């Protein structure tokens, strides 16, 4: 009788141990493994914007605190902060497109630099980051005023972190996505036009385009993968590719300026989008990539 009771008591414990072990093995089997890559391949190309330049977003500074300091950059004659979401080169190269290679289970080491987001003149730099799950980051406030950083999971989604940033100080944060979420947006709760974006990466095979729109990802294990291109106001593009040993594959991505994805609260009727506002240093409404 006592032996039967003992066996019955142990069965739930054994089941729990088995479950935990199974979850651990499942997690580890999907974790990226750093290995030495032999005969690695290269993917290179360019992201461009075609069609007409999308209208910029504007924020009336009179509605926000610290107007004198915030008007130091990216402000028009009507005291509107103008957000330059589409930075382009003369030939249409598009900046801040995150290129990622999916389904790489093992390959080169990350060697990723820590994320440091600067806040100066009521503006976050850089405007786009590549982020890993549970990665720490720092917000360096160079302004003499306080900012309140709110981190959203996806665009205007659930707030996953609230970071008060005292004047001229550094605040620490940490990225924690729920399952299947890839995008975070950080906005200052006091100055809504202060925005920066992050895109979740699973491996070190990624690239954030500069002003020329060009990208290059190297040392890739030969195989078949999905190559994605993401811009925070455009639909993600994807191409299935196969790379060979020591080979170079050329891939380009074209984003149509007429197909910007904006939330409903950012429309011309709401006053957030202004047709006659000019991007800093660019010609508005001109044809691109032709």
What do the PLM-derived regions correspond to, one by one?
Residues 6-8, 23, 81:
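Intrinsic-disorder/low-complexity peptide segments enriched for small residues
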Residues 5-15:
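Bacterial N-terminal signal peptides that target proteins for export
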Residues 14-24:
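Bacterial N-terminal signal peptides
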Residues 31-290:
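Extracytoplasmic copper-binding redox domains, predominantly the cupredoxin/blue-copper superfamily
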Residues 26-28:
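N-terminal signal peptide c-region/cleavage motif recognized by signal peptidases
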